Design a protein with these regions (language model features):
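C-terminal interaction surface of TIR/SEFIR-family domains
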Residues: 1-31, 145-171
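Short, well-ordered loop/turn sites that connect or cap secondary structure elements
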Residues: 94-96
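GIY-YIG nuclease signature motif recognition
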Residues: 42, 113-114
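Aromatic- and Lys/Arg-enriched surface recognition patch
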Residues: 1, 109, 115-165
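Compositionally biased, charged N-terminal/linker segments
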Residues: 20-90
Length: 171
């Protein structure tokens, strides 16, 4: 008896297909996705609707906090009081241009998928969540359950972390 497999499009491909109008022109539109992109979960001021999420969607970027550490993060930064070392290391050093970000709307759902297009920046004009990276949103305003996609696990509260999903699984 032979083993049979059903092939299905991945959740990321389905999101992109539903995004509507193609970005760029033709079938070879460059979405800016890197050759070996990591996939990141990003919380925009926590979960649910909020002013930071709305502003980020309108202006094509992601923002995180840890503002009390100031603009410059270095090896000398003392994380003993407020923590944040892992999140800030991910945002500044591990996340790369061309990586994919998924905006966490709840512990089980995402509301947007984008591609990182910029290096980390500090924006003092914001009262909170001053650390920013530019992104190109591929799809916004969705409400997709990704628990199955994320190995059966809900997302955690951490502001930024790499999802343990390969790009081939996502596509």
């Amino acid at each position: 008896r032979e083993i049979e497999y059903e092939v299905h499009d991945g959740i990321f491909k389905a999101f992109c297909d539903r995004a509507g109008t193609p970005i760029g022109s033709g079938t070879s539109a460059d979405l800016g996705i890197g050759k070996s992109p990591a996939i990141w979960k990003v919380s925009l001021e926590g979960t649910g609707d909020n002013p930071t999420r709305t502003e980020c969607m309108q202006n094509n970027h992601i923002r995180i906090g840890w503002d009390d550490y100031g603009e410059t993060i270095s090896d000398a930064t003392d994380y003993s009081k407020d923590g944040g070392r892992t999140v800030l290391n991910a945002f500044y050093n591990r996340m790369q241009i061309g990586d994919i970000v998924m905006s966490c709307y709840s512990s089980k759902t995402i509301d947007a998928i984008g591609v990182v297009t910029g290096e980390p920046e500090w924006h003092d004009e914001y009262q909170h969540y001053k650390r920013l990276r530019n992104v190109q949103w591929l799809v916004k305003g969705i409400n997709e359950d990704i628990v199955d996609f994320n190995a059966g696990k809900p997302m955690t509260l951490s502001s930024v972390y790499r999802l343990s999903v390969s790009v081939s699984d996502a596509l």
